[in-house]
Amino acid sequence: MVKFLEPTANEIKENKLYQDMGLSDKEYDKVVDILGRMPNYTEIGIFSVMWSEHCSYKHSKPFLKQFPTTGERVLMGPGEGAGVVDIGDNQAVVFKVESHNHPSAIEPYQGAATGVGGIVRDIVSIGARPIQLLNSLRFGELTEKQNQRLFKGVVAGIGGYGNCIGIPTVAGEIEFDRQYEGNPLVNAMCVGIIDHDKIQKGTAKGEGNPVIYVGLKTGRDGIHGATFASEELSEESESKRPSVQIGDPFVGKKLMEATLKAITFPELVGIQDMGAAGLTSSSSEMAAKGGSGIHLELEKVPTREAGISPYEMMLSETQERMLLVVEKGTEQKFLDLFDHYELDSAVIGQVTDTDRFVLTYEGEVFADIPVQPLSDEAPVYILEGRAAQFDAVNHDYSNIDAQDTLMKLLSHPTMASKNWAYSQYDQQVGANTIIKPGLSAGVTRVEGTKKAIAATLDGEARYVFNNPYEGGKMVVAEAYRNLISVGSLPLAMTDCLNYGNPEKPEIYQQLADSTRGMAEACGALNTPVVSGNVSLYNETKGDAIFPTPVVGMVGLIEDVDYLVDFKPSKGDTIYFVGEVKPDFGGSQLEKLLFNEVAHTDVAIDLEQEVARGEAIRQHIIDGKLGHVQAVGKGGVGVKLAQIAAYFNTGLEAQLDVSDAELFAETQGNYIVIAKQGKEIDIDGAEAIGTFGTESFKLSTNQGEVTLDVNRMTEAWKGAIHACMTSEV
């Protein structure tokens, strides 16, 4: 019998070794109460990952309960690997967003690559074929070498995995701000399509049913990855490089295809990806959802090397693995399938009726834990928050140089073209991509139909820091507008909540207020939350990131035919829809001129968002519009310049605003370009100019901005290239 040298239960207690795993004294005591004895080394490791912030949401769960999660189209909401929403004709869209922030800070290529791989497996575990990838990325300012290195590595990792596995990257966002120095945000989203009768759940039930492991052999990579993702980054974080998982997209592709075949077998009982906390979370969660027990015989787990202990097996986050429960007597059918795809697989245990999570190795018991308390009784913390205090600041915007300001904003990497990154992603694999990255939302045809899925992934930070409640509403509305801009009906959303240490009162209050705003917007815009992720402790040496909720939203296009002519032409009329107010607090103009965030009472009208959005969407479907863009960062001035640069053509517009108000970021506004001869009936729409002129010209109440189109386009397209040409 193999002997593993591990601390005893007494040594764990006396030396408080559980603290190194992320458990507090009170949490350790709760484990003792649940077990009725002191836990051994494997057991305390299991509790530490299952009760980590990453797996248990112990600081955010009360806020997540505010979100509306049901609707007439929602087939499956939070609690499974991903959300499932009906799109008609017995089909559904499956989607989720996940974070891989901490791993990407330490090992950017693998951190990003495994983030993509993990979210793909979440979608596949439901039984859906992935059709879209999206990503939301944030780094420190691109003038710094370290940020260039992180950016380069993350983009390469996303492309390296996504391109190999054969899923197009269709949309996303990339921003740069000093608040993300040392703590980049890497959020990945995947969207898939499934028939209703193929939807799977991660459940283990049926006494005696075998448990099958399939995928890469288990190694020591990623041990305590979930715990690592639940703590602040520090100078010691580099030593935790082994906590970063290693991806293998070629095995990932084979696993995806094998899984999609396995879900067609009626003998499949349940399936779940081995993601955060690996074999521990997948097996214990499946047992909990099935109201069953589970017994794993760990000597049967395929391992990469000899001598891997039960503790290491259970906490490893080796990638490209799935766990299945199948009907007793049919296991060989599944093993033969996986052998056909040249994947390692084995029966490693069985479902029991004991309600216990039991782990043995060659007959020796290494863990015996009640299932429900492990899965469902993680502590939940309700803390005292405190609103951040802002000094009263009244910045003077009266004497800006509009032309110089426009060029500076347009060429800042946050607002410049992201083609440097998108060109490294396969955008067309599968031949169903209709709208590629770079515009409001990605659009992908549903194969064999006239339908299409529009998807967007949007985050907000400076406004959430400025006013968390209103900022929370804004991030949901931004995603809604981006889907409206391609004529789709917004259906539902997934969220990724990226914040600092929730044990700090101001950050806890940011989380509380912003999620309240998000929940209100979800209700008003009829976009229920069907899946999501929380990433807390995003701090470096005690400095927190801006609170950054990220929203992934999907929309339905019933008939893609209108998209054939959805493009602007020379002579089309440009309309501005909305109104401009002197809203500068949290804006990119404020950042450019003063490099800070001043508190303002910026607000959003959700009722108006719905009315305006519906009107614009109907105009697109009716073929009256050639292009639509929601006005966002940089205001109407930057948005018009981006449109001109994207199409490399001039435009002329006259606006009843001051020079500074060209860059005000008043919420709810759009630029729409109407086709010649088409009547526009949108409340708040005003004709402001013409598309397709020789030069780029904006007139304000104070003067005129005139720019050479080629110069402007080169500045917009070349900004990130210029930063990345130096050796990184």
Curated annotation (Swiss-Prot):
GO BP terms: 'de novo' IMP biosynthetic process
Gene Ontology molecular-function annotations: ATP binding; magnesium ion binding; phosphoribosylformylglycinamidine synthase activity
Residues annotated to bind Mg(2+) 1: 98, 533
Pfam families in UniProt: AIRS (PF00586), AIRS_C (PF02769), FGAR-AT_linker (PF18072)
Active site: 54, 100 (proton acceptor)
Catalytic reaction equation(s): N(2)-formyl-N(1)-(5-phospho-beta-D-ribosyl)glycinamide + L-glutamine + ATP + H2O = 2-formamido-N(1)-(5-O-phospho-beta-D-ribosyl)acetamidine + L-glutamate + ADP + phosphate + H(+)
SUPFAM superfamilies assigned: PurM C-terminal domain-like, PurM N-terminal domain-like
PANTHER family, alphabetized: PHOSPHORIBOSYLFORMYLGLYCINAMIDINE SYNTHASE SUBUNIT PURL
Subunit structure: Monomer. Part of the FGAM synthase complex composed of 1 PurL, 1 PurQ and 2 PurS subunits.
Function recorded in the entry: Part of the phosphoribosylformylglycinamidine synthase complex involved in the purines biosynthetic pathway. Catalyzes the ATP-dependent conversion of formylglycinamide ribonucleotide (FGAR) and glutamine to yield formylglycinamidine ribonucleotide (FGAM) and glutamate. The FGAM synthase complex is composed of three subunits. PurQ produces an ammonia molecule by converting glutamine to glutamate. PurL transfers the ammonia molecule to FGAR to form FGAM in an ATP-dependent manner.
Protein name (Swiss-Prot/TrEMBL): Phosphoribosylformylglycinamidine synthase subunit PurL
Organism: Macrococcus caseolyticus (strain JCSC5402)
Gene: purL
